[in-house]
Amino acid sequence: MRKTNLLIGLLFLSTSLWGQDPWKITVSDVRTDNYYGVTVGNGMLGIVSSPEPLRTNNVVLAGSYDKYGRGRVSNFLNGFNMLNGSISIDGNRINRNNISGFTQTLDMKKATFTSRFTYADKADITCSYLALRQLPYCAMMVVEVEPKADITIAAVNTQETPDAFRDGRMFYNEINRRHAAIKLLTTQAQSPTGRLTVCASSAFMFPEKAGEEPRVTHTTHNSNSHQTSFSRKLRKGETYRFCIVGSTLTSAHHPDPMNETERLTVFACLEGYDRLMVRHLSLWDDLWSSDIIIDGDAQAQQDIHNMIYHLYSFVREGSELSISPMGLSGLGYNGHVFWDADTWIFPALLMLKPQLAKSMIEYRYNRLQAAKENAFEHGFSGAMFPWESADSGFEETPVWALTGTFEHHITGCVAMAAWNYYRVTQDKTWLREKGYPILKATADFWLSRVEKDADGSTYHIRNVVAADEWAENVDDNAFTNGVAKQNLAAASQAAALL
C-alpha cells in the first residue's frame, strides 16, 4: 500500500464548516460535485450516504470478496442496497432539486445518519438510517413526514442488482398472520465470478396495527430491478413514520443466504421499531463507555469522537474479522487487511475495547496455517503473514507490487499484536491456545530469515521492502530488524510464562 493519506478519519460531505457539537457533524450545503459520503456501520455492515434524499450510495459487507476488477486479486463487493427508497407527495417525486433546507447529520453517539428537508409548502421530511448494532446483517431506514397541508404520500422501496453481479433472481413473498403482515422484497445474484451467492431482503414496517397498515404492492421493472410501494393520505399536522428494514448475506456467511436474509428481515420487522432502536442505542452507549475526553477544545473532541466512532463502526466483537485501511466505507484498498490493522488500529481498540481488538487478532490466528504455507513456499520456516490479506489468509497483493513478496515486517507486526493482547488482558488461556502459536511460528520465521555474517558476530535481514514502501529490496531496514527482535523477545517471554 503506497501511503498517502490513510482514511480512517472521516471524508465528509462538502465544503461546509464542521460544527462544534462533540457528537454531531452536520452539513447544510449538500452538493453532488464533491460529495464523498459518510458511513454508518455495525462492524459487519457498512452503509455509505448519498446526496439524494432517501438513498444510500454503497453497502459493504465484511468478509465478502471475489476476484474481479484490478490486480487479479480478491476485492470487496459493492453489495445490494437494501435501503433504496423514494417518496412522492401529491404525485411529484422528491429529489435533490425540488427540496429546500436540506441538511445531513452524522450522530456519532447514536450511530445514525439523518437527512432533513422541506418539500415546497407541503411537508417537512426527516430520513434516518442505521446499521443495527444488535443485528450484524441488518439495517433500518426511518422516514418521518410532517405535513403542512393535507397531502398524499407514495413511498417506494427498490432493489437493484449491482452491475457487477450476474444471474440475478427476484422474489416477492407475503407473510400474513393475524397479528402481522410482512411483504418481503428479495433479490439473489452471483458475485462477478460466481464464487459467492449474494442476497438481500427488505420490507416496509408500519406503525399501524395489523390490518390497518397501508396496502403494499409489488412491481417488477426489468430483470435487474423490482420494488414495493404504498400510498397514504395524511392530514395537516399529522406526523407519520414508516420504516424500511433490510438484511443482506452471502454464502461466505451462511450456507442458505436467501432464506436467512428473509428470516432476519422478518425477525427485525416483528421486533418492531421501538425494540430495534432501544437495543441499538443501548449497545452504542456501551461502546461509548470507553471514550477519550478532551476539555476545552470542542473541535478536538469532535475529531477524537469521529476517529473512535469509525473504529467502533468497522470492527465487531465475535466476528473474527480484521479491518481494512478504509474500513467498511467503500471498496478502497480492495478491502484487504494490511499492517495498519495490527500496528495502528489494534492498539487503540485494545485499550478502549479489548473485545473488539480480540476479533482482529483472532482473524490472524485463524489464518496461521496459510501463513505457514506462505513461509514454506518462500523457503522459510514458521509463519510468514501476507502483506495484503483477505478471507483466505493467503497473499492478495497484486503481482506488480513488490510489497507482497518482500514487505516481511508484517509478520512481526502480527506477532506484536498477539503479545500486546496478552499484556493488556492477561488472558493466559488465550496466550497458551492462540497467542503463543502465533509468537512461536513467527519467531521461527525470523530465525530462518536472518543471515549470519561470515565471522558469526552479526545477523542481517536482507532484501526486504522497508516500512517506507519506496525503499525496495534493501538490507537491514531499521523497522524490519527492530520488529523482528521484538518478535523473538516476545516469543521467549511467552514461552517462559507457559
PLM ranges: what are they?
Residues N306-S313, Y363-A370, P437-R449, Q486, ...:
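Alpha-helical scaffold segments in carbohydrate-active enzymes
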Residues Q20-V40, M44-Y333:
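Acidic/polar, glycine-enriched structural segments that form the non-catalytic walls/loops
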Residues I153, A252-N259, D291-D295, M351, ...:
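Inter-helical turn/loop segments and adjacent helix faces that build the functional surface
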Residues T39-V40, I47-V48, R275-R423:
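Substrate-binding groove/exosite segments of carbohydrate-active enzymes
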Residues S329-V337, A383-E433, A441-L498:
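The feature captures the catalytic groove of carbohydrate-active enzymes
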Residues T126-C127, V156-N157, S359-Y363, F376-E377, ...:
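Beta-strand segments within the central parallel beta-sheet cores of soluble alpha/beta enzyme folds
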Residues F165, S313-S319, Q369-N374, W446-D453, ...:
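Secretory-pathway/luminal and periplasmic proteins that interact with or process carbohydrate-rich
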Residues M1-Q20:
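Bacterial Sec-dependent N-terminal signal peptides
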